Amino acid sequence: MKVIATNKKAFHDFEILERYEAGLVLQGSEVKAIRAGRVNLKDSFVKFVKGEPFVFGMHISYLDSANPHFRPDEKRPRKLLLHKKEIDKLIGKTSEKGYTIVPLKLYFNKKNIAKLEIGLAKGKTLHDKRESLKKKIMDREARAAMKEYR
């Protein structure tokens, strides 16, 4: 599994409850751009349109070596491919207040197919963000102390 992009802001702003692997409907030049690492997941989100999941705000840069006459929109909504049961479960959860779906990372699986890991998330409050930051610092210090002790 080759990870192309991660959404670090999602881990900071949200508490991830469940994770799902989704396929993407892409065009050829977009796949080439993803392989080149020209993708950004920051400020992207998943929304349901007529019962189908789409990812909005995912920026895939235009590749210079691609056809200059055919230039797709860099921030166009891209359809996600999930099983029907997963879609129904996510629609039910996101209809509740406070839940959202955010992209976590984009990668190529063993069969060289682009996959997007999405997560069912609940927003963190300022207090939760500070608490998780303190915990992260404490873990880092503990690891450093263990390293010194060896």
From Swiss-Prot:
GO cellular component, one term: cytosol
Keywords: Cytoplasm, RNA-binding
Main location: cytoplasm
Name of the protein in question: SsrA-binding protein
UniProt-listed Gene3D superfamilies: 2.40.280.10
Species the sequence originates in: Nitratiruptor sp. (strain SB155-2)
Family: Belongs to the SmpB family.
GO terms, biological process: trans-translation
